[in-house]
Amino acid sequence: GDVYKRQMLYNIHSPLEQFEVVSLAYTEIPYFGHVALTNLGLYTIITVFFVLAFHILGFNHKIVPSRWSLSLESSFASVHGLVKSQVGAANERFLPFVYSLFFFLLFANLNGNIPYGFTVTTSAIVSMGLSVIVFIGVTILGLSIHKVHFFSFFVPAGTPLALVPFLAPIELISYLARALSLGVRLLANMAAGHSLMKILGGFLFSLFTSSFLISILTIVPFVIFIAIIVLEFAVSFIQAYVFCILTSSYIKDAIDLH
């Protein structure tokens, strides 16, 4: 028993294992070949289910709103205010996109806080994919509105002609970086938080399974660990909100060329 306990204590798994995409089930389908359901696909489906369930439960015809209805209305008001302040009241047609994006990211982040769960947004395919989609969509929007004049975005107003060959490439690189910055910010923040919880959780488990005195003294760091978990829930909301704020800001830049 002591040998097994020592092996468990020193058998340290990588905190990055939780981000690995693994196949849960697979089958062979004619003309399609090998089709697999991964943990990424499963938790994406679960995320969409939670988003739909939240809105179905919040749909209420009664005069007195339920708690679900109040939470749904407050969430809608928050996202609506975000879009109105960033994009402008005249461009609220982008509200459905930003609203859907916010709730998908929010529930994807929150699902990752469930023990033994998988965080969809820690997958580069999802985070970087959403970032690139937003970038391409915003670029197409700007080109469709301003046509050739859109390229004036890369030359700041009042720039001397002699500096244009130097500033234009810098502005272009800065603009292209948007394709990655959204996804990298989301991916890095979520992966860092979950890695920290994995490391601290494993360390606390080792302390709790040692002597009685040490397990009693571990209660204090365990309380701090609970506070970090609560903070990670807040980070889940903040990262979804920041992603949507920057998306709305990029839409405004494409419309107004600021």
For every predicted segment, state its role.
Residues 1-2:
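Positively charged, low-complexity/disordered segments
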Residues 5-258:
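Selective transmembrane helix interface/packing segments
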